[in-house]
Amino acid sequence: MPAILAKKLGMTQVFLEDGKVERVTVLEAGPCPVTGIRTIERDGYEAVQLAFGASKEKHLSKAELGHLKKAGAPPLRHVVEFRDEAGELQVGETVTVEAFEAGQRVKISGTSKGKGFQGTIKRHNFASGPKSHGSHNKRAPGSIGASAWPARVMKGIRGPGQMGNKRVTQKGLEIVQLDPQQNLMLVRGSVPGPRNGVVEVRTDA
């Protein structure tokens, strides 16, 4: 089961063979050198470690530079482990977009766009209150519990707070096109995170 790191370049649209227009997200996927292999015998679990994203040496620690140099990789900013994805890979090999096929289903994980502190209407899609007749609670959350009983706010009550900037995984996304020459992967629909954000792409079994 292949996995790869990618950078979200943005969205566009392509014409399919039947003439329909499909909106797609363009990902710059790889190349990702293999910088580590985890085994059950030595580490207690199976995983492959991939690196991605060119970086200057001054932005990496000596430990990071030493680890990458030992694997024969250039200075790279992002190092991520993928559980149960090692397969036949060895340290020093490179994973490219050619490990995937058009029409394949993948799941993509990334950090969603941060929205800051937001109220319940934007954060949880609550209905707004009355907007006329002197109402003062157009965007108020409403009751969060009675005073006599339960005399407290119950666990799990949705309220205002930090919105976004969390790890999100979208499943069942279809690969529409691949361009191995430019390391591009076109995925149907949207992908978590901002433009130029780094995402993890795995096959969706």
Question: Where are the model-predicted features located?
Answer:
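Extended basic (Lys/Arg/His-rich) segments that typically form rRNA-contacting surfaces
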Residues: 1-205
